Amino acid sequence: MSALAWAHPLVAEWFINKFGTPTEPQELGWPHILSGRTTLISAPTGSGKTLAAFLACIDRLVRKALAGELHDRTEVLYISPLKALGNDIQKNLEVPLGQILQMAGERGLLMPQIRTAVRTGDTLAPERRAMLKCPPHILVTTPESLYILLTAEKSRAILRDVETVIVDEIHAVADDKRGAHLALSLERLEALTYRSPVRIGLSATQKPIEEVAHFLSGNGRPEPEIVNIGHKRKLDLAVEIPATLLGPVASNEMWDEIYDRIVQLSEQHRSTLVFVNTRRLVERVAHNLAERIGEENVGAHHGSLSRRLRLEAERKLKEGKIKVLIATASLELGIDIGTVDLVIQISSPRAIAVALQRVGRSGHWRGAVPKGRLFVTTRDDLLECASLVRAVRQGDLDRLIIPDCPLDVMAQQIVATCAASNSSVSRPATLSSGNGHVARTFLSGNSSDQSPDDPGWDEDELFALVKRAYPYRNLPRELFDSIIAMLSEGIAARRGRYGAYLHHDRVNRKLRARRGARLAAITSGGAIPETALFTVVAQPEGGIVGTLDEDFAIESNAGDIVLLGNTSWRIRRVEGKSGRVLVEDAH
């Protein structure tokens, strides 16, 4: 009980009834979070680090609700690298919030409901409008949607009152351009809010963990607190080698042997999660396993499937309605799929951290030992998997490298920042940030993109904002100025210049967005490469099954059979103009 002495009696009682005692990440993380320090919690999957971050926030909201001080404003912002993970977190938040509300009612306490909402690319327009009208107390979003919220004129206002930012699975974005994009969005959020939000990061174990912590906190701020539980958790990890002689490629005989062995292992466990490295292989493995143990016992999960089919596969595994689920990295992160007894990885996962993350999807209960089997298909696989298992047993990790000053991402964010300042929502201007605590005043803006009344961004102030993002800590001023020149002067082409998104007032050293800059920033932002996809539509129902790459779809003909979601579909027609592939069940 002493570990929860800080919590409101309702919150403490709920936690004890539900979990008994705190886990190590929770017990060590709460004091830092409650002190208002930037905190990174690094612990294995299933160790309770998500609740470690949320419980302090829930406690604060419960206290405000009981005191009649809970207003219609967003105070907690949760950022997930996956839309599916965000949806899952929101569902899991509804349970404790509902139970605490019920407990309050049973004790005769008047407590308004603490609301949660999800804002991602899947959020419907009516839900977005409702969110603007009545902001949720806890908002769940993705890095890309946060960027849009910060840039769009109407949505910026709901972020003004954010007091806590939780970045989940931070290791999944820190080492690529998507992470640099998020780091700049966090600095833009910092400049927008009334007070500096407390930042909480949740991560699988990384090396060096200090680098991830600095990525979270930003440049030039007080040292972040690190709760590092380590990854030397006991694992039941082994390499499965087929009897067939290994060669440079896997033979059909070897694949049959692998399928038979997976079936054998699945019969020894209640639920089995199989990871492969490509979407195509998901369908191939699912099809072959279904032939052996029945379609009703096998599921498929990857990014080309529709959201409905992915959620259905997750639900079936969680409810024990299927024995085996085959997935790509779409299930690698902490989506709640219930109790998994065994994780199988076909071919090398190519990274130690990925192997740990995937094997860690099993054994999600106290005292359980995660169990994983690595199936090799070639000689190279054998060498990689053997080295990987040895590294895991020795406690070694891959070294995480954060990209240094990605200029394309910076250009996007500069345009978005300047466009957002031309908003009817006033912008806090940074006056000083020497000790990491930013003092602010407010500059009134205007909703017109080219209003002379808009003060714009001061060059030095914008440069300081960019430099506070950890990936840009070493950004030279000359390089920043060259990007500003490109964005204000445009790029020379045969028919003149294009791509000029900013007005640059060199006399007053101010930057303002040109007309159309906000729209360009919103529609062209992000660091995820775009791919042309055709929507697969089942006939006659009209339900969306998933997507196919444009090249594959165009080269397909009526009558061809495609596999999606462990189901064979016969193509009826490919509609090039509408980007649709009409299919029917081939069975």
Which positions does each model-derived feature cover?
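Conserved nucleotide-binding/hydrolysis modules and their immediate coupling elements
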Residues: E489, R494-H587
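Intrinsic-disorder-associated, low-complexity terminal segments enriched in Asp/Asn/His/Tyr and depleted
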Residues: N446-D449, D454
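Intrinsic, low-complexity polybasic segments
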Residues: S424-T430, G434-T441, D449
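ATP-binding Walker
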Residues: S47
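Short, intrinsically disordered, charge-balanced linker/junction segments flanking boundaries
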Residues: I414-A420, Q450, D585-H587
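Helicase motor core with emphasis on the C-terminal RecA-like subdomain
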Residues: M1-A3, A7-E13, N17, T21-E27, ...
